[in-house]
């Protein structure tokens, strides 16, 4: 008999918590030092709310329209935006999420600043770094990250809270270890610069296939979808 989505979540959540605790210990930290963000793209609202009731405190959506269609149904939870964000969609979510993970250009940062100022709020953002230097991916070049942090930090209505990265797709999660280590070094380097309006609080890296390695290398936030909820059903 096929397991329900809730049964799949319950089984996976237990295993993931154990894996996070183990990886955190290897990096000299505790389970509580790691934020588990549930990536809820295509996940039914009833399953999301079960996850929240089970202890998930942070959720991340990838698509603006899907987020807006589900937002009113969420139980109390920290809501983040983790997908590619078009400048013309910024106005739709700017005051609805606590953190935007995917700021991948100065132009996008400018629009977030503009919309935040219109609403009299401060938007918390992460800078997305193209750590694998892949032409197919967006994000700031690794070598320009410190300078771009300085430039974006000058924009009003924005607070830089850290970095996000998606390394290249690999057959083995160990192949991504050097990329995660590189991101941790950049995270420390930017923090050392003590740039005004920038605090390196969050290093968001690691997804379903490589989150344990990411934590071992210094991630303090991981974004898990398939590992928590099972294979996605693309019906939205």
For every predicted segment, state its role:
Residues 219-236:
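Gly/Pro- and small hydrophobic-enriched strand-loop and loop-to-helix capping segments
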Residues 1-186, 190-209, 215-217, 229:
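Conserved alpha/beta-domain cores
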């Amino acid at each position: 008999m096929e397991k329900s989505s809730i049964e799949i979540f319950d089984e996976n959540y237990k295993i993931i918590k154990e894996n996070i605790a183990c990886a955190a210990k290897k990096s000299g930290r505790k389970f509580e030092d790691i934020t588990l963000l549930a990536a809820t793209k295509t996940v039914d609202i009833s399953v999301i709310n079960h996850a929240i009731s089970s202890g998930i405190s942070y959720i991340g959506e990838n698509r603006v329209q899907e987020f807006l269609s589900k937002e009113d149904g969420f139980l109390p939870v920290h809501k983040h935006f983790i997908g590619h964000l078009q400048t013309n969609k910024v106005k739709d979510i700017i005051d609805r999420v606590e953190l935007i993970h995917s700021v991948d250009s100065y132009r996008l940062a400018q629009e977030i600043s503009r919309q935040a100022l219109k609403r009299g709020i401060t938007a918390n953002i992460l800078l997305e770094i193209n750590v694998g230097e892949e032409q197919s991916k967006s994000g700031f070049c690794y070598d320009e990250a410190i300078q771009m942090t300085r430039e974006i930090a000058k924009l009003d209505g924005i607070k830089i809270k850290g970095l996000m990265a998606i390394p290249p797709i690999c057959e083995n999660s160990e192949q991504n270890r050097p990329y995660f280590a590189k991101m941790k070094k950049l995270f420390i380097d930017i923090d050392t610069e003590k740039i005004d309006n920038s605090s390196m609080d969050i290093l968001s890296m690691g997804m379903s296939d490589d989150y344990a390695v990411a934590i071992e290398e210094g991630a303090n936030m991981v974004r898990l979808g398939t590992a928590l909820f099972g294979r996605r059903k693309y019906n939205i």
